[in-house]
């Protein structure tokens, strides 16, 4: 449930 595009790769 992350809005960050970078963290979205993991989460």
UniProtKB/Swiss-Prot annotation:
<feature type="modified residue" description="Phenylalanine amide">
    <location>
        <position position="11"/>
    </location>
</feature>
<protein>
    <recommendedName>
        <fullName>Short neuropeptide F</fullName>
    </recommendedName>
</protein>
<dbReference type="GO" id="GO:0007218">
    <property type="term" value="P:neuropeptide signaling pathway"/>
</dbReference>
<keyword id="KW-0527">Neuropeptide</keyword>
<keyword id="KW-0964">Secreted</keyword>
<keyword id="KW-0027">Amidation</keyword>
<dbReference type="GO" id="GO:0005576">
    <property type="term" value="C:extracellular region"/>
</dbReference>
<comment type="similarity">
    <text>Belongs to the NPY family.</text>
</comment>
């Amino acid at each position: 449930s992350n809005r960050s595009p970078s963290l979205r790769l993991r989460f």
